[in-house]
Structures are given as C-alpha cells and as structure tokens.
Amino acid sequence: MKILIPMVGCLLLIGVFHSRGTAQAPATVWDGVFTADQAKRGEALYKQECAACHGDALEGNAQTERGQRLERVLPPLSGDVFMGNWNGRLLSDLFDKIRRTMPRDEQGKLSLKQNADILAYMLKFNEFPAGKAELPSDPSQLTETRFESVKPK
C-alpha cells in the first residue's frame, strides 16, 4: 500500500504534464477562419457600407488638416498600422469594435452575419488565407482566435 500511493501520484502527474504538452496552440487568423465565399459577400457589403469612409483599398480616410499634417478621420483597415493595432489581440475584439461602432452614423445597422462577412473580407484583403468554415457571427465563438500579423511557425 505504501508503494501504491506514490505510484498513483506519479502516474497522475505524468498525465497532467502529458496533457499540457499536447495541448493545441490557440487558433490564429492564419488558420483559415473564413471562407472565400464569405469574403466575397463581405466585399460587396464593404463597398456599400464602408468604402465611402475607409476607402476602396481599406486605406482609411485622411481628409482633415491640423496644422501642417493630415490626420486620419477613420483608421486604415489594412497595412502596417492596422496590423500593428490588432496584433496579438483576440479576433472577437475586432469583431466587437466593428459591430458596436460601425457604420459610423448608424451603429448596429448591420446584422451579426453582415459584420462577420465584412470582417472576412478585411482578413482576405490583408492576405490571410481562407478556409473551409465560415467566420462565426457569434462573437463568443471568436474569443479563442488571435489576430497575429506574422504567421506563426
């Protein structure tokens, strides 16, 4: 009995460490989290609802002058600034930002599905790969996916 208890304890510890070692890495936007068809729908919605302010090439809107420099009225949705702003954050944060604040003068106008489609287009535009499953329109299903600007190794 004295030997059995330590052996059981050791086996339990081995099981705990083994399960930690085989845990999957968190999903990222590099894992194909949207479909090409979804991004195509999102592109049409983007052009209709977003391009007037954020630009056809998702470059943002830099039309106000303050002193000698132009300041962006609305931020870019592509490129280094966009990637840097969202790097390391949860995809649910970006989805929620879009859902709560856009379109600028009609927040909440778009359905969750439309917001997911637009986000899929933004990801495609930023050269993240499409996959086989659509990006979920339920924000709680996006809390396990990280926005990583550089593809993990």
Regions from the PLM with identified roles:
Residues 54, 78, 102, 123-126:
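Protein kinase-like catalytic domain
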Residues 1-33, 140-153:
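N-terminal export/targeting leaders of redox proteins
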Residues 33, 58-96:
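Gly/Gly-Pro-rich "capping" loops immediately C-terminal to redox-active cysteine motifs
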Residues 21-45, 61, 106:
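Electrostatic cytochrome c docking/interface patches
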Residues 40-48, 88, 112:
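Sequence context surrounding c-type heme c attachment/ligation sites in exported
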Residues 42, 46-57, 118, 122:
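The canonical Cys-X-X-Cys-His
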Residues 107-153:
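Flexible coil segments in periplasmic/lumen-exposed cytochrome c-class electron-transfer proteins
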Residues 79, 83, 100-108:
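General structural signal for alpha-helix termini and helix-helix connectors
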